[in-house]
């Protein structure tokens, strides 16, 4: 997915793309919720039908929590989406992703949480989205056509040799 025309034109030199819209669904103990957080999510949780109703519900929960200056991820998430969404859709996912409790993580981690007051389940707001029809392996293979690729090579042991091969070296191994 991209919003950059130049990037889209570049990758289309190597592959044809199937149309694809990423619209994930969260499963909380058998209850299914639309992602990113949007009017479908708010309706599924609270039965709210308008952005105004959803905003009021979030504002009420934020006010009840009394959070004005979030000091950790938990507080920041509650301030952004309210207690219900935090408890059902943020807390467990974040704990699993980071291996830490939300109270132990800094607030800035969740500042980019997508929240939309529309009935749009499209996770990305990009005009170009797709999956290569022949797969990513075929696409990358075409991108690397004519380029020497060395696998299972210890760059760090042979650094001087490889550094002299080109002006720029892209090292993707562990440091």
Feature-to-residue mapping (PLM):
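Aromatic-residue-lined binding/catalytic grooves and analogous aromatic/hydrophobic interfacial grooves
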Residues: 175
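Glycine-rich FAD cofactor-binding loop and adjacent beta-loop-alpha segment at the N-terminus
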Residues: 1-14
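Active-site/ligand-binding neighborhood in enzyme catalytic cores
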Residues: 22, 26-167, 172
């Amino acid at each position: 997915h991209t919003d950059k025309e130049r990037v889209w034109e570049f990758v289309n030199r190597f592959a044809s793309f199937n149309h694809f819209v990423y619209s994930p669904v969260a499963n909380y103990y058998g209850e299914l919720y639309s992602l990113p957080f949007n009017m479908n999510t708010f309706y599924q949780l609270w039965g709210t039908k308008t952005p105004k109703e959803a905003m009021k519900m979030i504002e009420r929960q934020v006010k009840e929590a009394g959070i004005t200056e979030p000091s950790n991820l938990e507080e920041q998430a509650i301030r952004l989406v309210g207690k219900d969404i935090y408890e059902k859709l943020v807390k467990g996912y974040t704990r699993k992703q980071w291996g830490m409790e939300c109270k132990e993580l800094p607030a800035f981690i969740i500042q980019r949480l997508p929240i939309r007051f529309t009935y749009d389940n499209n996770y990305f707001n990009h005009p170009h989205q797709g999956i290569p029809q022949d797969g990513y392996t075929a696409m990358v293979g075409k991108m690397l056509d004519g380029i020497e690729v060395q696998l299972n090579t210890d760059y760090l042991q042979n650094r001087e040799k490889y550094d002299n091969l080109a002006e720029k070296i892209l090292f993707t191994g562990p440091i």
